[in-house]
């Protein structure tokens, strides 16, 4: 199914940068967008094939988005730590470190996935209760979450495997495999819901099965490849030193990614208090607006990986050039995505739910959230730049204060006196602008390209 032909790695250390960044970033963005589309198919299918209960089914899936994002984003950040460690080792031409980091990453993913699956089953009900999920939505939301959590081992394994490939500059292999598993996901969604007349349990099972397929296919590629990232069954063990390096970079990055979900859990709780229509509208809009974030975040990932390899090779000036180009090219790509989404927003919302009230409320969210994407693009690229140097903790702390702190304060202090959907959504531009300013100040004060100029050894 997947050819084992040799794919030439993207040379991040030599030649022009501007034309290579899109070659790395756009497949990453396409992978994330396809992943969102396939995830959105859960909502689209239950919203169109579950009859009179469609609004409850859509709200049930949407009610879990913040919890699932919290878990997945945390470990995607840790996987990014693995990406940086491997990229830096490639830049240093340290084959032994690359091998140890790859095998350690695989074990981290499997063990973490099992742990999350077990712990998640125990706390699923209290979590949904804390989110104030309405009584008519709660049973379906709980069923969806519990089935989804069973798939955490394969979901996390795929994300770590994708990070391993991206550390070499290969962003196309994860894209191809995700496309295969994603098409399977859509077909299974339709089969379970439209044919077998299942509800949220059908789309949850389809998600688990398709993620299992993607993780198995990527693992097969890692076993068969002759590149530095080759996986040998006999070498699958955790190297403590490498584990420490991955966690030192990845855990703060994971916390930074999870901050979105933590803050959004608080926001989701406020949204839930406004009723089922607002819940359904917000859920549908989120699945559209995230496309713009996927575009800007792909350039942040490119920034991290390019800087990681060049820092390992001691090419500090090239690292600074990477940051500037990522901001410029990321801004152009993000602006194009925003315009396209706003022009087609109402039509896209109708795919999830054709209720006119849901579409109107959902479009309001699109306008307000997308207006803040410029701030997201700036702070994500600056954070990605610093992560490439292994400088991850302080940006994570600042992001926690800027996003999580501001949004929680907004919901606790401002929302009670302005209990409208717009009152909730204003938290997005406020928190993101504050965070962009704080991250810029960190970059100016710590200046990692100078701070690490003479310290380009092991991270």
Question: How would you name each of these model-derived features?
Answer:
Residues 55-66, 141, 145, 204, ...:
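Small-residue hotspots at the loop-to-helix junctions and early N-terminal turns
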Residues 58-118, 155-174, 268, 281-339, ...:
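Small-residue-rich hydrophobic transmembrane alpha-helices
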Residues 28, 32, 44, 84, ...:
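Transmembrane alpha-helix boundary and packing residues in multipass membrane permease domains
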């Amino acid at each position: 199914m997947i050819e084992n032909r040799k794919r030439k790695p993207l040379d991040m250390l030599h030649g022009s940068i501007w034309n290579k960044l899109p070659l790395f970033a756009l497949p990453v963005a396409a992978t994330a967008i396809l992943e969102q589309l396939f995830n959105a198919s859960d909502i689209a299918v239950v919203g169109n094939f579950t009859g009179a209960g469609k609004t409850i089914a859509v709200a049930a899936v949407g009610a879990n988005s913040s919890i699932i994002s919290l878990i997945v984003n945390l470990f995607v950040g840790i996987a990014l730590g693995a990406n940086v460690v491997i990229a830096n080792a490639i830049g240093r031409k340290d084959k032994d470190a690359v091998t140890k980091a790859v095998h350690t990453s695989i074990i981290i993913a499997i063990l973490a996935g099992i742990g999350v699956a077990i712990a998640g089953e125990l706390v699923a009900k209290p979590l949904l209760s804390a989110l104030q999920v309405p009584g008519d939505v709660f049973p379906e939301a709980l069923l969806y979450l519990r089935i989804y959590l069973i798939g955490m081992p394969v979901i996390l394994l795929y994300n770590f495997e994708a990070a391993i490939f991206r550390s070499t500059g290969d962003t196309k292999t994860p894209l191809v495999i995700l496309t295969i598993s994603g098409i399977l996901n859509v077909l299974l969604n339709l089969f379970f819901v439209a044919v077998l007349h299942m509800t949220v349990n059908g789309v949850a099972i389809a998600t688990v099965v398709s993620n299992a397929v993607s993780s198995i296919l990527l693992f097969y590629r890692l076993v068969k490849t002759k590149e530095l990232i080759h996986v040998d069954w006999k070498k699958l063990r955790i190297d403590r030193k490498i584990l420490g390096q991955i966690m030192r970079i990845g855990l703060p990055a994971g916390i930074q990614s999870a901050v979105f979900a933590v803050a959004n859990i608080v926001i989701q709780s406020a949204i839930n208090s406004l009723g089922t229509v607002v819940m359904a509208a917000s859920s549908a809009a989120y699945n559209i607006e995230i496309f713009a974030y996927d575009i800007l975040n792909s350039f942040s990932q490119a920034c991290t990986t390019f800087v990681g390899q060049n820092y390992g090779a001691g090419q500090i000036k090239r690292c600074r050039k990477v940051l500037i180009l990522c901001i410029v090219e990321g801004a152009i790509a993000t602006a194009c995505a925003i315009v396209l989404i706003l022009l087609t927003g109402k039509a896209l919302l109708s795919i999830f739910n054709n209720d006119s009230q849901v579409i109107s409320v959902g479009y309001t969210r699109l306008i307000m959230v997308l207006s803040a994407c410029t701030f997201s693009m700036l702070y994500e690229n600056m954070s990605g730049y610093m992560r490439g140097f292994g400088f991850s903790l302080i940006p994570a702390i600042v992001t926690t204060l800027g996003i999580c702190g501001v949004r929680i304060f907004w919901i606790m202090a401002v929302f009670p006196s302005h209990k409208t959907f717009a009152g909730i959504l204003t938290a997005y531009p406020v928190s993101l602008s504050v965070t962009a300013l704080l991250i810029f100040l960190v970059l100016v004060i710590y200046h990692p390209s100078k701070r690490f100029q003479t310290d380009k050894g092991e991270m």
